[in-house]
């Protein structure tokens, strides 16, 4: 985790706790010539734009007040909901995703695939099982949790 992400996580957590919001993810990424500091937040029932603006304003005030500046380069601050394809980071995210359609990225390919989508039907501390449609049939596939690089909710077409 970069120092910018760590700093922002520490700064935003009390703001979110005060409002009963949840921190989903903080990322600091360069896209083209620009840096983006993205803070994804949520709450029970979903977060709205006014709540995102409130958190953005409070976080911006805290960042601006720090000396020395914890993020010396210019960047764009974005505070938003995680959206329909919310990342699955914490154990509670996975538990809430049981029965839902998800996308997983694997470190090592399984059956020649590193990107797999299916309905999460079971999980435990070591593995998760997806119901995956392959051509015209549905098959249950089990994956080691340690082989999962990323997971997120997915939209099924």
Curated annotation (Swiss-Prot):
Gene3D superfamilies: Ribosome maturation factor RimP, C-terminal domain, RimP-like superfamily, N-terminal
Keyword rRNA processing: no
Pfam families noted in UniProt: DUF150_C, RimP_N
InterPro entries registered for this protein in UniProt: Ribosome_maturation_RimP, RimP_C, RimP_C_sf, RimP_N, RimP_N_sf
Major location category of this protein: cytoplasm
GO biological process: ribosomal small subunit assembly; translation
Keyword terms of this UniProt record: Cytoplasm, Ribosome biogenesis
SUPFAM superfamilies noted in UniProt: YhbC-like, C-terminal domain, YhbC-like, N-terminal domain
Top-level division of the source organism's lineage: Bacteria
Protein's cellular compartments: Cytoplasm
rRNA-binding keyword on record: no
GO cellular component annotations of the record: cytosol
Family of this protein: Belongs to the RimP family.
Known function: Required for maturation of 30S ribosomal subunits.
Name of the protein in its database record: Ribosome maturation factor RimP
Organism for this UniProt entry: Enterococcus faecalis (strain ATCC 700802 / V583)
